[in-house]
Amino acid sequence: MPITDPVKLQIVYNRVLNKKVCRKCGALNPPTATKCRRCKSKNLRPKKGFKLK
């Protein structure tokens, strides 16, 4: 069942999808990270997911 409430969508986005993923080791990092917490690589990408409307 899809979530249609915009407040709940924002909560889901911040809790689940607003992260960065290391391309080298796959570790999840905070959205403000500049380097990986596990392997210290600077090769980070935003986590894939849906876009907020």
Swiss-Prot record:
A Gene Ontology BP annotation from the UniProt entry: translation
SMART domains: Ribosomal_L40e
Pfam families linked to this entry: Ribosomal_L40e
Keyword Nucleotide-binding carried by entry: no
Entries under InterPro entries matching the protein: Ribosomal_eL40_arc, Ribosomal_eL40_dom, Ribosomal_eL40_sf, Ribosomal_zn-bd
Record-level GO cellular component terms: ribonucleoprotein complex; ribosome
Keyword field contains Ribonucleoprotein: yes
Example of a GO MF term: structural constituent of ribosome
Key words, A-Z: Ribonucleoprotein, Ribosomal protein
SUPFAM superfamilies attached to this UniProt entry: Zn-binding ribosomal proteins (SSF57829)
Recorded superkingdom: Archaea
Family (UniProt): Belongs to the eukaryotic ribosomal protein eL40 family.
UniProt xrefs under NCBIfam families: PRK04136.1 (NF003161)
PANTHER family: 50S RIBOSOMAL PROTEIN L40E, LARGE RIBOSOMAL SUBUNIT PROTEIN EL40
Protein name: Large ribosomal subunit protein eL40
Source organism (scientific name): Staphylothermus marinus (strain ATCC 43588 / DSM 3639 / JCM 9404 / F1)
Organism phylogeny: Archaea, Thermoproteota, Thermoprotei, Desulfurococcales, Desulfurococcaceae
